[in-house]
Amino acid sequence: MAIQHKKGGGHRGRGSKTGRSRGRKFETSRLKDVREDESSGGEEDVDGQPTEDMNDSEGTDVSSESGLDEPPKENSYSTLLKLLNTDAKSNEPARKKRKIKANEPDANPVEVSIPTADDTEQMDEVADTEASASEDENMDDEDIPDEDYAEDIGTDGRNDMFELHFGNPDETELSHKIQACSKAWKSTKADLIDGLYSVVSMPDAGGISSASLPTTPSPADLKLKQKLARNAVSFDRLNSCLTPYIFGYHDTLFCSRTTQNSAKLRDLYCLHALNHVLKTRDRVIKNSAILSRENNGDVELRDQGFTRPKVLIILPTRQACVRVINSFTKIYPMEQQENKKRFMDSFSAADSDEWAHKPDDFKELFGGNDDDMFRLGFKFTRKSLKFFSKFYSSDIILASPLGLRTAIEKEGGKKNENDFLSSIEMVIVDHADALMMQNWDHVEYIFSNLNLQPKEAHGCDFSRVRQWYLDGHGKFLRQTLVFSAFNTPELNALYNTQMQNVFGKAKIMSKYEGAMLNLRLPISVKQTFSRFDSASPLKDPEARFQYFTRTVLASLARGWTESSPRKKSGGTLIFIPSYLDFVRVRNHFANSSQTENISFGLISEYTSVRDSSRARSHFMNGRHSVLLYTERAHHFRRYNIRGVTNIVMYGLPDNPIFWGDLIEYLGSAAGGTSTPTVRVLFSKWDALKLERIVGTARVRSMLLEKGGDTFTFV
């Protein structure tokens, strides 16, 4: 049975633990006729059967997204011989030359001529064969330079970070930095704008690092392709601040993404990705033209990776993918957009009217098509954009973590298909906080499969492969950009282990005033924070459970046993961030003598809508004294729970917005006789969460206070 794709809410929930999907798997068979395949957008069905032309998407199967095409398994030497034999038999006239300067002689045509429209057929043949099949099998218009090609290649590249990073890096310095990456990093800290600060880390190779880089006022100050510069949107203060890190090819972890700045951030990284892809493409075309004019074989030009895909963008939903594509087409408008209608039919949907009362962050994430199972190849030619191109023929791959993992993994113990990720030079992870609510294991799995040595050649011309790829050092030149609403231990682990860029990395975070100060309630709420000792993160779950049952639950149980029309501890909401902790607490309530007389309800991310409605109704009416509620359930549903008089937080929420949502549940108790209370459990391993709730100024004293372990705010 094929994987079912639904629009608007069909896939909200955690991803599969193993990353495997039900149904047919991706296979790597490819069409025999390359021209026919490319003209139809390079689309291949999930089971490996070619589809019809996808320009008209009516009646197409949504599950048939971009596959992993397998180029012919022939080595570059035999390909070169075939090309030479073809040239020897050719009776075509000599290729025309066009001089740039009118008075310049023909003595040195290599320096004065550039490819012209008359060279199209031969240029296509050379670029397709000598420049490797991985850079594209298509022989139409995409090996012809852009209109602004001559102007771009004549630009001084000394201040172009693309040239410094990927064009002509100093081999000795590069080797020294790669060795330093595995030893020690030197970090510096600096304040930025609007409460932001940066921590920049550089390989300790004797250089000087700076945490605060000069801002970039506008796109005109960047070394952009001319066509991109004409359509680039203006920079606000935040973009001007981030541009030096992003366009300077630093790895960047940005932990202050909001609904207000998300569109500007998306335009910024899309501009950077397009600039990188187009400059890479122009360099390959330029060098292919040089090689086609040189017959002595002495020229060595290394400008490629093992495979064509250069940019990987990881997103939470299909609608997020639509927004990225819209940014691409806004910055780089093209009249021809193959398979655009099919893409919009498969990926875009209207917002649900039922969510009009939901908060803005919820509508941004789940608005439109919130399916979290997708993958898409995206390809540029001189005249068109091609959707649903095969991975090995794509420039950019956009995917959800679950969708990409199912493309990598193979059934029956076969080797994973990850060669198409071997030459990724830029990874962009947007809305990372939402990806953690799906299944972060999928993201870690994807990073573990990046920049590995390919198992097969895939038609690669190894004479054009950059030396650092051959040496297995691709990960040290890959740029990783991660955008999240807040920082977490998982993101810190990704930053420390997977961001190994020799040009350095930057972590940009916010200083917090504290979510507990921004409550909108007509009554005062007593907020008590209880600190417990925990020896290590591994032992933290056990220490938390013991403290909860022996201290917090024991005091609540006394209130539940008192006789009154509504028990003193009735209306208690117990918020539990982790599902594993939720299961443990649920079992304790079901089996322990401590809670044998307590009626309780359950709402987790796996609870059906019907059962959730019943549990909320019983809790509001007093039939349930306690309601156990998980963070993921709140993330995916944003229930408005009534009847709450007390809140116990088994752990702090990752998202500070959830703190305000939960405290506002107490508004229904405004007419009661007792003051609503909030009690929170935390340990020293909750420092990042605690900072967002109590504020940067208070968190240190609460973690290190020697005089007591209880802190109360009213």
Swiss-Prot record:
Under SUPFAM superfamilies, the record lists:
P-loop containing nucleoside triphosphate hydrolases (SSF52540)
Q: Which domain of life is it from?
A: Eukaryota
Q: Which UniProt keywords apply?
A: Nucleus, Ribonucleoprotein, Ribosome biogenesis, rRNA processing
* Region described as Disordered: spans on this chain: 1-145
A GO CC term assigned to this protein in UniProt: nucleolus
Q: Main site of residence?
A: nucleus
> Which Pfam families does the annotation name?
Utp25_C, UTP25_NTPase-like
Q: Where is the composition biased (Basic and acidic residues)?
A: 24-38
Q: Which GO terms describe its molecular function?
A: rRNA binding; U3 snoRNA binding
Record's compositionally biased regions (Basic residues): 1-23
Annotated family: Belongs to the UTP25 family.
What name appears for this protein in its UniProt entry? U3 small nucleolar RNA-associated protein 25
Query: Which species?
Result: Trichophyton verrucosum (strain HKI 0517)
Q: Which gene encodes it?
A: UTP25
